[in-house]
Structure formats: structure tokens, C-alpha cells
Regions:
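Non-catalytic helical/linker scaffolds that mediate oligomerization, partner binding
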Residues: 1-469
Length: 469
């Protein structure tokens, strides 16, 4: 079933949700499932996908790629104390040693003295020293190095190809297992996105949506071009706070929201919602509410479902917060704020004027037939204060709409005509509002494609009283 959410929920699949009896309790609260191949084996991830599809085939499956990353290669957890000096060596495979930090970056000898090695998003910090030709690090921030953890280098850019062989293999695996989107890690610029798309074309994956994760200093500098090149973005808040201070990070998020809105792309923000701590949960809930009012499309639970003690409660809580806040935002766009694409000028003007109509006339809902999902996505990005009910024949389109705030989609048959859509839309509105709708309430119907692929379809807007649809 396709349950209606205002902002959308993205959840990471992990052992905490790997039983049908558990997943079935929360699947209606989740729009997109993130599959992370950096941890765990492919057979387990295949099991996750099969289970999701069995319970609800309408969900979007998003594969998380590694990106050009470096990871620890210690076979066991390693305890590091502040001030401790630890040898750092390259290892392609996991090694069993409690006194050396192993990493899978081959050019360790090129890492300059003074470089800060950041393990697991700032959990542990090590300053590189060079002693007699061997790489040694002094622990600046102590902690437990878990197995296969991600490493960043401050003030040093490792020599790595953007799209490595492992990511290529994972993407091919994802296509074979019918994933609908990929979230690409450590994007730096639009060229990285283009490289992903070029590879997707070679493996018959053109339909896969590319969602860029904003988590590098280069991505911050090239934010606008990355948003334009990708199908949407994920804001990694913790990474931003490592890269810059909170004031600048907040400005980055606000700029990203505005630009995504003006060109019609979804923006997703990760969250570490944790209901096990009432005080922490209350503070996190306030942040979520604030971002909802600014126009964030979706919230991604990562650690919350991966290692949290109460993953189901975290999902329920996020869903509750989202639906308490409703659809309305603080945004109000004029035409000068909207990026009109030269190739879609007619569609974009129709969509914008539908949005303005929804602001100026008290309408109850928007019915939006869409072929590629473009019209519904652009409408959603402008954030009208009413639900958008989208109809599409296209599998790729409705999977994408699972990222779009305020959109409830329905798959229709190729034989559907315009009169069918109007009548079904009317019944859906009746159900959606639980009968709380009057005969004189106004409904807007929008279609902005020059291709007549539904018999009797207009290209423009129609405004009806509910009783006249």
C-alpha cells in the first residue's frame, strides 16, 4: 500500500529490522530503504531487498556506494588512548594486530606529517608523525576503532579514482537486484556525478536515480553544480560540522534547500533521532521540526536503525513528528526565485502558476498526472500547502516520488483516460481527508507535458469544485 506522508522517511536496513515480523510493524512508516554494502555481505543485503519487496513492492530501494574512501583494516577492535603513538600501515585485507592501525590506502608513505586522520566521522583523531621512514600517529582524540570504519584526512587529498572497481561491482549488483536509486558518497563536483551516470549507461542503469551525499569540503564549494547534476542530495549534518562551524553549516543547509526548491530536486537530511534518551530526543525533535518548516523533503535514519537499541521506536517517533507538522512551510516563491529550464519552459510555467494558484485560492488538493515525475517533483519542490496526488504509468517516476514531500502517488494502467484519473482522484481525496471535505471545496488538476500520452488530457490547469469533478 502507498501510505501518505508529508515529509518522507528513509531508513537504513540492518539486522535490527531483518525479520518480517519486525519490519512489517514499521514498513508503512517508511518510504525508502537504504542498503549499505560497506557493511555486511551481499547475500544478507539480497535477503533484505527480497523481504522489503515481499511486504510492499511500492517502496524505493536506495543503494549506498562507498565512494573514493579509505577504511580501517584491523580484524579486531583497537583501543586508542589520548597521547598514545600508534604505527600506521597499509593492508589490503584485514590484519590481526592490536598495536598497529591498518588502513587500505596503499600510498601511506605519501601522507605528510601533520595530517589529521579522522576515523568514523570525528570519533577518533590521530595526528601523523614521521619517524625514521615509518608512519606513526599520535592520538589527539581517543576512542575505540571499530572494524572497517571510514577514514578522512584533514589537509591531505588521497590519490584515489572517484569510481572504484568495488563501487562499480556494487552498482551492477544493485541493478541486478532492482534497486531504484543510488546514494553516492564523497561527491566533490558535477564531474563525479557525470562519471556515475556514464557508468550507469554502460550497464543499462540509466533509469537509476543518483542522489549525491554532501559530505566533503569540495562538495560545499561546488554545491550548486552538484545539485544541478544529481537527482537530489543528502545533507550529512555531522560531516558538515567537521568541515565547518555550526553557523556556516546552517547557512549551507539553507542555501541547499533554496536551490533544490528552485530547480525541483529533493533534499534529504540525516538524523540521529534516539528515543532512548528523552532529553536528547526532545532536542532532536525540535531540529527536525525546524527543518520541516524550512522545506526538507525527507529525513534519513542511519545510525538510528543500524545500531540503535530501539529502531522501531525511532521510526515511529520520526513519523509522528513529521505528521504533526503537516505540509505547510515558511517558503513562498515568486517567479524570480524559480529556475525556469529552457528545455521545459512551458511545463515550468504551468507548474509555477499551479503553485501560485494554490497559494492564492483556498484549494484542498492538487491532482497531477505525470509521465516522468517531473511535474509532481517541481510542484513538490515549491512546497504548496496542500497534498499532491500524482498519477503515473512509469515505475521509475513513482519510485522517485517516494523522495518528494507532500506527494502521494498512484500507478495507473496504460489504458487510463483523463476521465478515469479525475474520478479516481476524487475518491482518493475523499479517503485522504476522511470525508472532511465539502462539495464546494476546490481541487486543482495540473498537467504540464507536451506529450499527449493519456487520452483526453489537458496541457495546463483546471480548477473544479469537488462536486463537479
Amino acid at each position: 500500500m502507498n501510505y501518505f506522508h508529508n515529509a518522507k522517511v528513509v531508513a537504513t536496513m540492518w539486522p535490527s529490522l531483518d525479520k518480517e515480523t519486525v519490519l512489517s510493524k514499521v514498513i508503512n512508516n517508511i518510504d525508502t530503504f537504504r542498503i549499505n554494502l560497506s557493511h555486511g555481505d551481499e547475500e544478507t543485503k539480497k535477503k533484505y531487498i527480497n523481504m522489503i519487496v515481499k511486504l510492499d513492492s511500492s517502496k524505493t530501494i536506495m543503494l549506498d556506494t562507498r565512494g573514493p574512501e579509505v577504511r580501517t583494516r584491523n580484524k579486531e577492535e583497537l583501543i586508542l588512548k589520548k597521547g598514545q603513538e600508534v604505527p600506521i600501515e597499509h593492508a589490503e585485507f584485514f590484519k590481526d594486530d592490536y598495536e598497529t592501525l591498518y588502513i587500505d590506502y596503499a600510498l601511506t608513505h605519501e601522507i605528510p606529517e601533520g595530517t589529521i586522520i579522522d576515523i568514523d566521522n570525528g570519533t577518533i583523531l590521530i595526528e601523523v608523525k614521521n619517524k625514521k621512514g615509518k608512519l606513526v600517529g599520535k592520538v589527539k582524540k581517543e576512542g575505540l576503532v571499530l572494524i572497517n570504519r571510514h577514514i578522512d584526512f584533514e589537509w591531505y587529498i588521497p590519490e584515489l579514482p572517484y569510481l572504484g572497481e568495488k563501487d562499480k561491482r556494487h552498482i551492477v549488483w544493485g541493478i541486478e537486484h532492482k534497486v531504484n536509486a543510488i546514494s553516492v558518497s564523497y561527491i566533490k563536483n558535477a564531474s563525479n556525478v557525470a562519471e556515475i551516470r556514464d557508468f550507469l549507461r554502460t550497464v543499462e542503469g540509466e533509469h537509476i536515480r543518483v542522489i549525491a551525499k554532501i559530505e566533503t569540503a569540495d562538495a560545499l564549494k561546488n554545491l550548486k553544480e552538484v545539485i544541478e547534476a544529481a537527482d537530489g542530495i543528502i545533507i550529512n549534518w555531522k560531516k558538515l560540522l567537521i568541515l565547518t562551524d555550526e553557523k556556516k553549516a546552517t547557512k549551507v543547509v539553507e542555501d541547499a534547500i533554496k536551490w533544490c526548491h528552485t530547480i525541483g530536486k529533493p533534499i534529504i537530511r540525516n538524523t540521529d533521532l534516539d528515543v532512548s534518551s528523552k532529553k536528547l530526543a526532545k532536542a532532536q525533535a525540535e531540529v527536525i521540526r525546524e527543518k520541516i518548516s524550512l522545506g526538507i523533503d525527507a529525513f534519513m535514519l542511519t545510525k538510528d536503525t543500524a545500531v540503535a537499541e530501539e529502531p522501531i521506536e525511532n521510526i515511529y517517533k520520526l513519523y509522528e513528528i513529521i505528521n504533526e507538522e503537516g505540509i505547510s512551510t515558511t517558503t513562498n516563491y515568486s517567479l524570480k526565485n524559480v529556475n525556469i529550464h529552457d528545455t521545459d519552459i512551458i511545463s515550468d510555467y504551468i507548474t509555477y502558476n499551479a503553485y501560485r494558484t494554490s497559494k492564492e485560492i483556498p484549494i484542498k488538493a492538487i491532482i497531477c498526472p505525470t509521465e516522468s515525475g517531473y511535474t509532481a517533483a517541481r510542484l513538490s519542490a515549491l512546497k504548496p500547502d496542500v497534498p499532491i496526488i500524482a498519477f503515473t504509468k512509469n515505475d521509475t517516476a513513482y519510485r522517485y516520488l517516494n523522495f518528494m514531500r507532500g506527494v502521494k502517488w498512484y500507478k495507473i494502467a496504460d489504458t487510463f483516460e483523463y476521465t478515469n484519473i479525475k474520478q479516481i482522484g476524487k475518491e482518493i481525496i475523499r479517503i485522504l481527508f476522511k470525508g472532511n471535505i465539502s462539495l464546494d471545496d476546490k481541487i486543482l488538476i495540473v498537467h504540464s507535458s507536451l506529450e499527449q500520452n493519456i487520452s483526453g488530457m489537458i496541457n495546463g490547469m483546471e480548477l473544479y469544485k469537488f462536486k463537479d469533478i
